[in-house]
C-alpha cells in the first residue's frame, strides 16, 4: 500500500499532504494573508512558505502516524503557478527525496485538483470546471489527456473577484473570494455588467475594468451598495461559467460535472451549476474547502496515481514550469 507525500505551494497556500491508497491521512495547510486592498507578491509569498514548510512537514507526518521510512514517494507541484513559491517548495521536495532516498514526482497543479475531486466525490468521467485565482478551464478526459474545451482568454475568475475585493478594501482573511461571497448574500440589486462568452471561452478583464471604474461613482451616488456590486459580479461571472460548462457537456455527451479549484467552494456557484445539471439530467459533484482550496493532499493523490502507473521524475528534470498546461500531461493511469 504505497504512501505518497505531496507538497503544494503554487500561490498563497502552502500545504503538505499524505495519501495512502485513496485515503487522506493528513492535509495541513497555511495561508499567506496580506492587508486589505493588497495582493500577494511572489517573493513575499515564497518567504512565507519557506518559514512554515518544515513545520507543516512534521505536522503531516505526525497526523498521518507515519515516519519517513513509511513514505514511498515524494510529489510536488511542478506548475502552473507563481515562480518564487513554486521554486521554494520544489527545493524542499528535492531535498527531502534525496535525504530519505525516495523517488520524486513533479505533478501538474490542475491535475492534482481533478484527481482529488474524483477521489473525494466518486465522479467517474466528469466534465470538469476548474476555477481558481490563477486558472479558469473547462476540461474533459479523452485518449489519455485532460483536454481543455474552453478557458479564459485573459484573467482567471478568481483573479477577477480578488481584484474587485481590493477596490472595496475587503479583508483577505480567510480569502477575498470568501468575503465577497458573504457580502453577495446581502445584495438586493442586480447591476447590469458586461457578459463575454466566446464559444466555450470566457473573458473577465472587461467586466473587471467596467466594475472597477463604475464602483466609486455608483457607491458615491447611492445607486447601489457594495453588497449589490458583489452580488452582481458573482451572478454575472458565474452565469458565464455555467454556460460554457453546459456547452462542453453537450459536446461531450457528459452526465457528470465536477467543480474543482478554490472558487469551487462558492455555494452560489454550486447552486447555479446544480440547477443546470438538473435540467440536463446530469449530476453535479463538488468538494468543500478542505479539498477545493489548494492543498498538499491533492498533489499526493495525483502523485499516487502517477507512481502506481510507473511515473518518476529524474532529479535533473525536477524543476518548475510556471505555464504548465493541463493537456501537456499524458494521463497513463486512466483507461
Swiss-Prot record:
Single biological process term from Gene Ontology: tRNA threonylcarbamoyladenosine modification
Binding sites annotated in the UniProt record for substrate: 130-134, 162, 177, 181, 266
GO molecular-function terms, A-Z: metal ion binding; N(6)-L-threonylcarbamoyladenine synthase activity
Cofactor(s) of this protein: a divalent metal cation
EC number: 2.3.1.234
A GO cellular component annotation in the UniProt record: nucleus
Catalytic activity, reaction form: L-threonylcarbamoyladenylate + adenosine(37) in tRNA = N(6)-L-threonylcarbamoyladenosine(37) in tRNA + AMP + H(+)
Pfam families referenced in this protein's UniProt entry, alphabetically: TsaD
Location within or outside the cell: Cytoplasm; Nucleus
Protein residues bound to a divalent metal cation: 109, 113, 130, 294
Family: Belongs to the KAE1 / TsaD family.
Entry function: Component of the EKC/KEOPS complex that is required for the formation of a threonylcarbamoyl group on adenosine at position 37 (t(6)A37) in tRNAs that read codons beginning with adenine. The complex is probably involved in the transfer of the threonylcarbamoyl moiety of threonylcarbamoyl-AMP (TC-AMP) to the N6 group of A37. OSGEP likely plays a direct catalytic role in this reaction, but requires other protein(s) of the complex to fulfill this activity.
Name of the featured protein: tRNA N6-adenosine threonylcarbamoyltransferase
Organism: Rattus norvegicus (Rat)
Amino acid at each position: 500500500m504505497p504512501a505518497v507525500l505531496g507538497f503544494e505551494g503554487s500561490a498563497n497556500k502552502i500545504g503538505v499532504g499524505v495519501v495512502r491508497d485513496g485515503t487522506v491521512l493528513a492535509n495541513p495547510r497555511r495561508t499567506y494573508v496580506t492587508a486589505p486592498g493588497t495582493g500577494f507578491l511572489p517573493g513575499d509569498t515564497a518567504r512565507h512558505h519557506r518559514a512554515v514548510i518544515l513545520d507543516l512537514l512534521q505536522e503531516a507526518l505526525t497526523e498521518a502516524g507515519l515516519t519517513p521510512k513509511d513514505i514511498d514517494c515524494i510529489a510536488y507541484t511542478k506548475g502552473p503557478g507563481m515562480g518564487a513559491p513554486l521554486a521554494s517548495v520544489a527545493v524542499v521536495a528535492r531535498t527531502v527525496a534525496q535525504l530519505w532516498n525516495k523517488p520524486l514526482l513533479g505533478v501538474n497543479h490542475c491535475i492534482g485538483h481533478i484527481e482529488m475531486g474524483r477521489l473525494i466525490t466518486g465522479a467517474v468521467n466528469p466534465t470538469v470546471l476548474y476555477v481558481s485565482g490563477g486558472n479558469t478551464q473547462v476540461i474533459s478526459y479523452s485518449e489519455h489527456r485532460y483536454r481543455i474545451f474552453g478557458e479564459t482568454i485573459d484573467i482567471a475568475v478568481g483573479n477577477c473577484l480578488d481584484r474587485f475585493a481590493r477596490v472595496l478594501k475587503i479583508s483577505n482573511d480567510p480569502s477575498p473570494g470568501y468575503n465577497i461571497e458573504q457580502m453577495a448574500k446581502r445584495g438586493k440589486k442586480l447591476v447590469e455588467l458586461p457578459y463575454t462568452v466566446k464559444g466555450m471561452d470566457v473573458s473577465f478583464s472587461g467586466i473587471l475594468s467596467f466594475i472597477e471604474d463604475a464602483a466609486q461613482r455608483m457607491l458615491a451616488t447611492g445607486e447601489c451598495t457594495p453588497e449589490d456590486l458583489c452580488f452582481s459580479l458573482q451572478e454575472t461571472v458565474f452565469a458565464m461559467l455555467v454556460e460554457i460548462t453546459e456547452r462542453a457537456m453537450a459536446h461531450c455527451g457528459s452526465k457528470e460535472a465536477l467543480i474543482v479549484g478554490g472558487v469551487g467552494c462558492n455555494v452560489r456557484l454550486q447552486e447555479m451549476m446544480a440547477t443546470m445539471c438538473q435540467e440536463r439530467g446530469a449530476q453535479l459533484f463538488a468538494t468543500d474547502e478542505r479539498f477545493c482550496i489548494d492543498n498538499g493532499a491533492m498533489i499526493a493523490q495525483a502523485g499516487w496515481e502517477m507512481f502506481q502507473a510507473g511515473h518518476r521524475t529524474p532529479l535533473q528534470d525536477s524543476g518548475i514550469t510556471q505555464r504548465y498546461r493541463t493537456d501537456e500531461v499524458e494521463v497513463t493511469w486512466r483507461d
